[in-house]
């Protein structure tokens, strides 16, 4: 597998297709289907959200479906605000990172800062979306992993906090409480609801990442990663 990054400058595209083209990430493999990821932006007033779009897939209908789903999911962060991008005094800057890109999975992380003038403090946003390249659908943690108390215990023992300040955080949760959080993971469709879940998952080449909402003083979100090899008994399919 070869991943090639090419930076493009001064290439503009019509606003109707979401702004300027800034970068190109090309994925090649020895499979029958190659694809490229290109960074696009949603802009409105002081709101900027970057998200990837695919090109070069052999199956154009699947590519169209994926691109529509990716953009829709990227913009769900707007549901945190009562009037979305039209919210008075809103400044929002969200960037995306490709966590995994192969013939089976595309896993995307979004993070950034949102602030409404006059509020006590800005919000550190973090959310993710993972797609099966075989059917173009977004897939949640519980569709890939058997979630039970044994998995919760394994996550507590084997995972590492990405922030040293959050080491030991999972140990402070009972297996039942941690399991309840994991079972609600990846519910992008509930963002903005009263009982929304702030738990998300992502995949890298060798790990599963879990993001859990925490207090603003702790950074609003905390991430933990566990090696895929350590959770093989819980996987519903090889990854």
List each model region and its residues.
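Compositionally biased intrinsically disordered regions enriched in Thr/Gly
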Residues: 14-239
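Sec-dependent N-terminal signal peptides of Gram-positive bacterial secreted proteins and lipoproteins
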Residues: 1-19
């Amino acid at each position: 597998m070869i991943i090639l990054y090419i930076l493009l400058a001064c290439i503009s595209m019509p606003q109707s297709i979401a702004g300027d083209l800034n970068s190109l990430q090309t994925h090649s493999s020895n499979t029958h289907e190659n694809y490229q990821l290109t960074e696009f932006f949603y802009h409105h007033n002081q709101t900027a959200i970057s998200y990837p779009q695919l090109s070069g897939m052999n199956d154009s209908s699947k590519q169209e479906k994926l691109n529509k789903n990716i953009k829709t999911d990227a913009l769900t962060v707007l549901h945190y605000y009562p009037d979305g991008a039209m919210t008075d005094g809103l400044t929002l800057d969200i960037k995306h990172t490709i966590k995994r890109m192969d013939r089976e999975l595309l896993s995307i992380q979004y993070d950034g800062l949102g602030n409404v003038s006059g509020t006590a403090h800005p919000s550190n946003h973090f959310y993710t979306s993972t797609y099966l390249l075989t059917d173009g659908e977004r897939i949640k943690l519980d569709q890939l992993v058997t979630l039970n108390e044994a998995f919760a215990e394994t996550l507590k023992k084997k995972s590492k906090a990405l922030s040293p300040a959050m080491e030991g955080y999972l140990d402070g949760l009972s297996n039942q409480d941690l399991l309840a959080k994991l079972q609600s993971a990846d519910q992008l469709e509930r963002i903005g609801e009263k009982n929304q879940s702030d738990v998300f998952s992502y995949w890298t080449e060798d790990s599963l990442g879990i993001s859990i909402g925490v207090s603003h003083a702790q950074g609003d979100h905390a991430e933990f990663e566990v090696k895929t090899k350590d959770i093989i008994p819980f996987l519903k399919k090889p990854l």
